Amino acid sequence: MKEEKSFVKEITPQSEDFSRWYIDVIRKADLMDYTPVRGCIVFKPDGYELWERIQAGLDKRFKETGHRNAYFPMLIPESFFQKEKEHVEGFNPELPWVTEAGGEKLEERLALRPTSETIIGHMYAQWIQSYRDLPVLINQWANVFRWEKRTLPFLRTSEFLWQEGHTAHATEEEAREETMRMLEVYRDFVETEMAIPLYVGQKTPSEKFAGAVDTYSIEAMMKDGKALQAGTSHYLGQNFAKGFEIKFLDRDNQLKYVHTTSWGVSTRLIGALIMVHGDDRGLALPPRLAPIQVIMIPVGPPKFRDKVMARFDPLFDALKAAGVRVKADLREETPGWKFNEWEMRGVPLRIEIGPRDVDNKQCLMVRRDTGEKIPVPLDEAVERVQALLEEIQRNMFVKAKEFRDAHSHLHINTLAELKAHIARCEETGEIAGFVLAGWCGDAACEAKVKEETKFTSRNIPFHPPARKQVCLCCGKEAQHTVWFARAY
């Protein structure tokens, strides 16, 4: 993560340098700032407000599905990580450790949590005794630490914010139902609120969460064609239950291990929002998630200000009363400067009122997604705003899906064809995107594809647009149809 401190005058076009465009946008929109600690960023108010909107939407859904919030310690004893072999091997390189406290060396190192299965497993073992204690349905909103070598704001940082759900169940069936239920909660939220289309499916064994039996993911395509894993849901089986002795007496008075799940999304979703919808003018936020849905700007010479505000203020109040997140920009800047500023910040809808509009008893509405300018009678303005916000939300999803589908390739069947596709895209500047291909199930084939192309398996989709018959790598019969892509 190059820590660029200078003010961004102009946003680099996406077609010129997508990575530079991304940094320019988040800096110019004032979403974050860098700190002296590598990979640790400040979420400035405009950036944190996006996370608050995501939190609010997901938290509501979690509570509707019976989950409650709790908070567990950030410091985790080293010995806890030894209780689940795969888990410690998966996270060990990324763990930051606390070795001293109070001026003395600690008897046991404490990890800054990379995820909380271990500490939560330890506590569940104290709390769960009987089938009457089940299920346990808990979510935690927290910060976590993974010492990343290559960092990028919001997408890959050493410290990030997330939620992690942890549940315990009496049976495998119940736990698997929970795993899929929460995957669907994520899919619904990201597609309906964030307007981001997803490929939903199961991770291959080499890509699953360390310590899980099965991992499922939602995968999104960014505007540079790369994949972003937007959320995961894990069926952990009894792996952590056995490691932490989480047992219960069932109805027949038999002592059994629980079945557990975990599931999470993080501030990566902010990065996804920017990279899926943003353009060369800056951010473009879907109305349901935008902190400000409508920006109102008075225009015209100062001598007409009272005349304009006599119509401006009542409309502002009416929109606020209707539940629209509306803001008025009354600063001493030119209207043109304000238009560009709020377009760059991604506000879905702009309303302009000038002296001529007052004479005509109308206002001018301008859509961020299409740039369309729509004159609207003032007495219809509130209803039109509500309708336009829904239309913008739908249109942003449709545009993102059309882009994704246009760059999802279904006719590449061999490793040679994949290499040729990548080479052609690099030569022409086209987007390589996602490739749907067959896979025999051999981890060596999956690893070879990654090594030779940097394309990784994203997931085995539940509903693939086609079924592949032969393995992309070895040509043997395919056991799975898999999405491959380069990824963040």
From Swiss-Prot:
One of its GO terms (molecular function) is transferase activity. It catalyses: tRNA(Pro) + L-proline + ATP = L-prolyl-tRNA(Pro) + AMP + diphosphate. PROSITE patterns: AA_TRNA_LIGASE_II. Consists of three domains: the N-terminal catalytic domain, the anticodon-binding domain and the C-terminal extension. HAMAP family: Pro_tRNA_synth_type3. Belongs to the class-II aminoacyl-tRNA synthetase family. ProS type 3 subfamily. Catalyzes the attachment of proline to tRNA(Pro) in a two-step reaction: proline is first activated by ATP to form Pro-AMP and then transferred to the acceptor end of tRNA(Pro). This is Proline--tRNA ligase. The lineage of its organism: Bacteria, Bacillati, Bacillota, Clostridia, Eubacteriales. The gene is proS.
